[in-house]
From Swiss-Prot:
Residues 488-500 have a biased composition (Acidic residues). Residues 910-929 have a biased composition (Low complexity). Its main location: host cell. Glycans are attached at residues 37, 591, 661, 801. Pfam families: DUF587 (PF04532), Herpes_UL87 (PF03043). GO terms for cellular component: host cell nucleus. This is Protein UL87.
Length: 941
């Protein structure tokens, strides 16, 4: 049959045109010529004709759909994309272009519909067939633009984009004489339908039936959102109107049907809000139970209250602040409290119709005003129903509740629920909510409110549906546009990587989808190779809870390890009441210290410190300040331990990291003293030898042996500071980095997720230096590769539980306080000294600078001299070679004075004109002769 609609047979549907009948064609007709809108003159009359009731012919509707389906461009090949293009034309809606035809062409065009109307605006004068000599000259027409003339015909069709009509045959010739070329640069055009295939209002739901055979409702919604964003705000109202027509919202049901549908729709929305609440217990179920019960009792008032706009100020006559704070906490709503000034909002009718131009979503009680977020208007209205409309629910509902007059609802109704005799909807944890109407209490109450006329109810129903349907789509698209304008193109590409494609257009308007898909494929293939890179790790809890934050600049990489973080969060006390008082009270164990300055109790354990700020306003909410080191799961574990000691009912996540301290080591530096000697705009602390550099309003402290601490920041802010510090180090004049060692130690840190202890680092340093001494500098690359492969295979792995040189509370809790006190020390000059007194990150040159030659055996001094000589031969800067030469000169001179180890100092490799700052000697290593006792032998090692 000619014009048959596409049907699903297997996977793809085909349009089969049977017989010898020619398929009716859709032609391209301009709607803007020389900045003149040709559709404006007939818009009122055509809208009236379009809305006029008319019997629907299903076969004609299928023929219209088939004609539009065939009118798709050639590059749109798949069935869903072709149906989306048909949907796009239907969303833009019908248009009409007036024209005046002379006797030569009258009656010859199958697309010209006869009419008689005087047009003051522009219209097309179709005067003859084009005689330009082109291929289509015998078919196409020519036109000119007229004004103040009578229109004899009308061209009707659907508004389309010009890019959709590129391959459609044009009704007018494209030559300059024909006039068709003048409208090709406009954005919009018309897909002109034959005269017997014109559309009417009642045809749209039947066209949606044809679309629904290919596309789902969610795909249609996504496409509508994409088209609205692509065409802009000017075309959005037109798209929304035709979108509603596709779903038959123009069909006005009878009054009882409309009321029942509206009630069911509100019940469905309230149930969706209830299922979206995270906590299902007595507080949340009592709130929604009262709202639903009031909806069944007084449906009209509650529905009007739930539709209050954000500009309307809601006044309450009954309010309980402690209960409200607890409800807001469990619903996770952001509210702010203030004073309600007189004159900002005048109270009236059902909730105060006065407006405050400066504030929105206000809920006022006496002098107190509560401001909700811009997206929480529905929640504001729910609280208005709960406290104002449902305050006397106990006298009319299914269970008796104490009625409060003036000062709020009694605390006895805090845990009340609806009667189990009602038809209920059960939540996941057993709490039930009513979803059916309550029985009518009395005839007087039933007839207390006058009924509206049927037409007003139907109109109200359509308004409610339209508001609830399109508010979410518009809000989602505005957020997407705002995020795209703020973050730019890079974040959009990252969104494509992560799979969040809700806001991306599902249809290729510009023809760039294939190229973007290819670029995304290449990017994913590149990232698949780097799946084990630190930047690709998935962090539980986000970057704020990352134990390791790594950045790299050129070939320099730095890993910052979190030492401790301070986390703020809220918690609610459990329902365990004090004996005989009926009031919740915190259970304070003996290990919690009380602060006499404020309402604070401190809970200290080796793993964490929790400061509890107790509320004194009977809200039963505690503010927690947690000081801990560890990952997000360890933080949750510490909260569980804290919950065993204190009667906490719920912790409210997500937690906020307000302070985070990190520590980092710069590996591979040949001379670690350069970092603190070649920095400008710094200052030194007086009580401790620490250099402070100010970066992004954060004071970064640099200690000896290229170790730094970064306070207060974490996540992206920490990465920005690390990049700036690396940039300063990279631009220093005398900085030389051994990238072989740098790569090995960076890999060790990432492999063990902990900073390298002093002994583990010295083992790798001296082992590599001895290998260089044995095999020479020519084998340096092979030796560096060998050491790196050994580190990758775990030969130099270490345990963070053995790094007791830093008294970390979390580490002490894991290994025990007795083992944590066994700090590795050495015996120097009959005194115990920590192994890392020179710095945990000290390298060979830093260690040898502090060695006194006359205090160590001759054989070990010889090894040190040979190691320094090997390092001097591979050094990359004259400054480092000069420092090594001075160290060798000091060691050999001191040894020659006693044992004659070096007959003469080694030759100077570079000029000694530049002065090197001397580093004060702190502690020397003992052992002038080979020790005999076991304790002395351990100390010498």
């Amino acid at each position: 049959m000619a014009g048959a609609a596409p049907r699903r047979l297997g996977c793809d549907a085909l349009i089969v045109v049977g017989g010898s009948a020619m398929p009716r064609r859709v032609l391209h007709v301009p709607v803007h010529v020389r900045a003149c809108n040709l559709t404006q003159e007939l818009s009122t009359g055509e809208d009236a004709r379009f809305c006029r009731p008319r019997p629907v012919n299903v076969e004609r509707v299928r023929a219209v759909f088939a004609a539009l389906y065939r009118a798709c461009p050639i590059h749109v090949r798949t069935e869903p994309e072709r149906v989306k293009l048909v949907l796009g034309r239907l969303l833009l809606g019908p248009v009409a272009v007036p024209c005046f035809c002379d006797g030569e062409v009258e009656g010859h065009g199958e697309h010209l519909v006869p009419t008689t109307q005087f047009c003051r605006g522009p219209l097309l004068y179709v005067h003859r067939r084009c005689c330009c000599g082109s291929v289509t000259a015998g078919r196409a027409l020519s036109y000119h633009v007229l004004e103040n003339h009578v229109a004899t015909h009308v061209l009707r069709g659907l508004l389309s984009l010009t890019e959709w009509n590129r391959e459609l045959p044009s009704l007018f010739c494209d030559c300059p004489g024909g006039g068709g070329a003048s409208g090709t640069e406009e954005r919009y055009a018309m897909a002109c339908l034959p005269r017997d295939l014109s559309l009417h209002l009642d045809d749209y739901p039947y066209l949606m039936v044809e679309i629904g055979r290919v596309l789902s409702v969610s795909e249609v919604d996504d496409y509508v959102t994409a088209v609205s964003g692509y065409l802009g705000e000017a075309a959005a109202p037109r798209i929304q109107v035709h979108y509603k027509l596709l779903f038959g919202l123009n069909v006005r049901p009878q009054a009882p049907c409309a009321l029942d549908a509206t009630r069911d729709f509100f019940l469905l929305e309230l149930q969706k809000l209830w299922l979206g609440v995270e906590y299902h217990h007595e507080v949340t179920s009592e709130f929604f139970g009262r709202v639903l019960a009031q909806l069944h009792r007084d449906r009209a008032r509650v529905m009007m209250a739930l539709r209050l706009p954000e500009q309307t100020v809601c006044h309450l006559s009954t309010f309980v602040l402690s209960r409200f704070k607890r409800q807001v906490l469990y619903f996770k709503l952001q509210v702010s409290y203030g004073k309600c000034r007189t004159g900002h909002a005048d109270r009236s009718g059902g909730g105060g119709n006065g407006g405050n131009q400066g504030h929105h979503n206000l809920l006022c009680y006496r002098r107190l005003s509560v401001t909700f977020a811009d997206t929480d208007t529905v929640w504001r209205n729910l609280f208005y129903v709960y406290y104002e409309l449902a305050r006397d629910l106990g006298s009319h509902g299914t269970e008796d509740r104490p009625v409060s007059r003036g000062y709020g609802v009694s605390c006895a109704s805090r845990t009340s629920r609806l009667s189990p005799s009602e038809s209920t909807v059960v939540s996941a944890n057993g709490h039930a909510l009513s979803s059916t109407a309550l029985p009518t209490t009395s005839a007087g109450h039933k007839l207390s409110l006058p009924r509206d006329p049927a037409a007003d109810r139907v109109r109200r129903y359509v308004c409610i549906i339209s508001r609830l349907m399109y508010a979410r789509y518009g809000e989602r698209w505005r957020k997407h546009c705002q995020r795209r304008s703020e973050t730019g193109e890079e974040e959009e590409e990252e969104t494509l990587e992560s799979g969040e494609t809700d806001a991306t257009p599902p249809f290729d308007f510009t023809g760039q989808q294939l190229r973007r898909a290819y670029q995304e494929h290449r990017r994913r293939k590149h990232l698949a190779v780097q799946r084990y890179a630190p930047c690709r790790r998935k962090l539980i809890g986000g970057m704020e809870f990352a134990e390791v934050t790594g950045v790299s600049l050129d070939r320099i990489a730095v890993n910052a390890f979190n030492t401790n973080r301070v986390i703020n969060m809220k918690a609610a006390l459990s329902s365990i009441a004090a004996s005989g008082l009926g009031v919740r009270a915190p259970r304070l164990p003996k290990n919690m210290t009380h602060s006499f300055v404020m309402y604070k109790h401190t809970f200290k354990e080796p793993a964490c410190t929790v400061s509890t700020f107790v509320s004194n306003d009977a809200v039963y909410i505690n503010s927690l300040n947690v000081n801990i080191r560890g990952s997000y799961p360890e933080f949750l574990y510490s909260l569980g331990v804290y919950r065993l000691h204190v009667n906490i009912d719920h912790f409210f996540l997500p937690a906020v990291v307000c302070n985070s301290n990190s520590s980092l080591d710069v590996h591979g530096l040949e001379d670690q003293a350069v970092i603190r000697s070649e920095r400008s705009k710094v200052y030194w602390t007086t009580n401790f030898p620490c250099m402070i550099s100010h970066t992004n309003n954060v004071n970064v402290g640099w200690f000896k042996a290229a170790t730094a601490i970064v306070p207060r920041v974490s996540g992206a802010d920490l990465e920005a500071i690390l990049l700036k510090e690396l940039s300063c180090i990279k631009n220093m004049r005398d900085v030389c980095i051994d990238y072989g060692l740098h790569r090995v130690f960076t890999q060790l840190e990432l492999r063990n997720s902990y900073q390298i202890p002093f002994l583990a680092k010295q083992l790798v340093l001296f082992l590599r230096a001895c290998l260089l001494k044995l095999h020479g500098r020519e084998k340096r690359l092979q030796l560096d590769r060998l050491v790196f492969e050994a580190a990758q295979r775990g030969l130099f792995d270490y345990s963070k539980n053995l790094t007791a040189h830093t008294k970390i509370k979390h580490t002490c809790a894991l290994i025990g306080s007795r083992l944590a006190n066994n700090v590795p020390k050495i015996l120097a000059r009959n005194k115990k000294v920590k192994l890392d007194h020179l710095g945990r990150n000290a390298n060979v040159l830093t260690v040898c600078r502090h060695v006194e030659a006359h205090k160590i055996p001759r054989t070990r001094l010889k090894v040190l001299v040979e190691v320094l000589g090997a390092l001097q031969s591979i050094s990359g800067t004259p400054h480092t070679r000069e420092v090594i030469h001075q160290t060798l000169f000091r060691l050999c001179s001191a040894a020659a004075a006693t044992s004659g180890l070096c007959s003469s100092p080694p030759p100077l490799c570079v000029s000694s004109s530049s002065s090197v700052p001397s580093v004060p000697t702190s502690v020397s290593v003992d052992g002038s002769s080979e020790p005999t006792s076991p304790r002395a032998r351990f100390a010498s090692r």
